Amino acid sequence: MMRFTKFYAPSLKEAPKDASLPSHIFLTRAGFVEQIGSGLYNFLPLGKRVLDKIKNIVKEEMDKAGAQEVNLSFITPASLWQESGRYNVFGKELLRFKDRKENEFVLGPTHEEAMLSLVKNKITSYKQLPLHLYQIGLKFRDEARPRFGLLRCREFLMKDGYSFHANEEDLGREFELMYKTYSQILQRMGLDFRAVEADSGAIGGSGSKEFMVLAKNGEDDILICENCDYAANVEAAKRAKKTCQDERPEANYASKFHTPNIKTIDSLAQFFKINAFYTIKAVVKKAIYENESKLVVFFIRGSDDLQEVKAQNTCSALELVDASEEELKKAGLVAGFIGFVGLKDIDFYIDFELENEKQMIMGANEKDYHLIGIDVVNLNKDRFKDLIEVKEGDCCVKCGAKLKQSKGIEVGHIFKLGQKYSKAMNANFLDENGKSQPFYMGCYGIGVSRLLAVAIEANHDEKGCIWNKTLAPFVLEIIVSNLKDEKALEFANKLYRDLTNLGLEVLLDDRNERFGVKMNDFELMGFPYALVIGKGLENNEIELIQREGLVKELIKTDELMEILKKKVL
């Protein structure tokens, strides 16, 4: 029998000092988790029960999709990461260490290399493909500033899966299957989510979708079409080409115009009495690479902003930082007057919406001068890239309707890795013609421990957690208001046995505490329902409380089981 007096759930009156998000505050106060170090958490019985439910849902859906579960070592030899080329690229988040024999290892934040090593030289023929292996295990990422509880910690539980294919078409089929599988996982958990276009980040690859649970405290900005199913992370969002109804500036030919001290887009637009849409803005960044750094110039409309992740991917840099005035001078660039005409010895890219635009105004690479009447034509096609940040109110690239901005928390990510890792690690198979080919790979991750926190970020109130029936550690709590009332206690014990025999997860609060304390804990822990057995039992009445909205209802004892079967079971 699951009695509160025997159940370990130490609740706290005060939240941790560094806790700012509801999930961090309530999960710690309610005794679901306990922080033992920076970004490190223990899961107590309540938290472990929820964690197991999440794991079971993930496992059931992955198995249903034909994936096979394995369990890889938490520690990976550094040689595998060196072979793939990620050892130095990944940065300080990758925890590197040596054993007593000076052998180098890493704590795996992801397991592409380890999983590829598992199948390399064992899957040798197209006849053995496709293959999808997954695991649910610990990961470690040495975050510089762990925060937000389970949402950004250093050690976390994750489901990561990897698929191997003979061709790109079959990889595409598996990608779509995982899209449906992840959608089903999150639907079963009762979460409001969107699958969004995304940047592949350090993992790499081409096709990429993130699964975002909508929450007002979300750390990611996402854009959602008001009409169709298009949704994208702001780092990867696209839009229908923007137009402007304002009059375009006219010049009979391209010419240089004196613009004294006109260094900003706003002052340039005012000077020529035009919309900034018809100007070209230069954004100069210093691109950091493994062994060097250099300046790169990105040209976009004056009315747009540079999307830095897009820009970083465009020039394949490890990082982009602002260029200093000294660096601009050294490169011969005049701040406020930079243009691509005549620009030499510096890499530059132009936003693809500017291609074939005419009668534009931009810097002349000379102090106090701009070029007018510029046509963006006859340039190398490779210079045109998607560089701008899409914003709320822009039009959907799929249907043309307006985009709205929302907040989301990433809980899953699926990638088409292609042949990036298999080529780097020389992992091949023989195709139908007997020719050696690198595997096509897919990668599919979902944050299991993160989902526990996300469920509360999406569903809580000022009093505490609000669990749905699928994820709740207990679906129903039976609260005896007065333990000295033997009749009430006897009724509660019998009710507990009857409900558990029906398969319901029930917690009996038999603590010798004030009724107010018990109710506060119920509201904090957030089980979907509570039954209060008190003085009303004399009139054959019991109070049923629904945690969401704290809706209360008096029920006759002879109708209780029937109502519980309808509402709770």
From Swiss-Prot:
InterPro entries: aa-tRNA-synt_IIb, aa-tRNA-synth_II, aa-tRNA-synth_II/BPL/LPL, Anticodon-bd, Anticodon-bd_dom_sf, Pro-tRNA-ligase_IIa, Pro-tRNA-synth_IIa_bac-type, Pro-tRNA-Synthase_IIa_type1. It is an enzyme of class 6 (ligase). Its EC number is 6.1.1.15. One of its GO terms (biological process) is prolyl-tRNA aminoacylation. Belongs to the class-II aminoacyl-tRNA synthetase family. ProS type 1 subfamily. Homodimer. This is Proline--tRNA ligase.
